């Protein structure tokens, strides 16, 4: 579980816009001279605000002059995220999508194949949202396998949590939340009240994650 001290670093996403992104990217200035590609994992429940965060985070990285790739996953759903991210597409940002696959294992193989091809594109950073086909630990294990371990290293692991998260979650949802929070370097709160109760919401989520 994420400790109280770690959770005090929760960031804010206010509403669907006006996101405050303060992710630590101290290594950005050093990445130009490295061979390994940083891979950022963005996790969170369906509807938590992952795509909105990816859009803002990718825009921030582009302003730093980085070349980035975004790998979208449409397993089990019609992919609308790609449409929301299209405006990022350009010389320094490419969007890739994993589509189709009748089962999870087939989709995982396609996911790995796509990561292999992206490793050869000269990106500084690759942003991945693996929900539906991997949990974070499984994804880490996959990156340690040949040939991905030659090209990738873990960058930021960021979990998006809706500030209005229900108190009474199913056992499966509680396990998933705890697992994602435990692996995250940063927890980002989405949909915080702009005018009041921000601190109360933060404390409630911290308490929920740590219980």
Question: Which residues does each PLM region occupy?
Answer:
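Cationic, low-complexity basic patches in intrinsically disordered or flexible, solvent-exposed regions
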Residues: 5-7, 14
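A short, aliphatic-rich alpha-helical micro-motif
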Residues: 120, 178-181
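G-domain G4 guanine-recognition motif of GTPases
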Residues: 130, 160-164, 186-204
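Position-driven detector of the extreme protein N-terminus
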Residues: 12-14, 32
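Charged helix-capping and loop-helix junction motifs
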Residues: 172-176
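Nucleotide-state-sensitive switch-loop elements of NTP-binding domains
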Residues: 37-43, 48, 52-170
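Short, positively charged and aromatic/hydrophobic N-terminal segments
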Residues: 19, 23-33
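Conserved beta-strand/loop subsegment of P-loop NTPase cores
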Residues: 69, 153-161, 181-192, 211
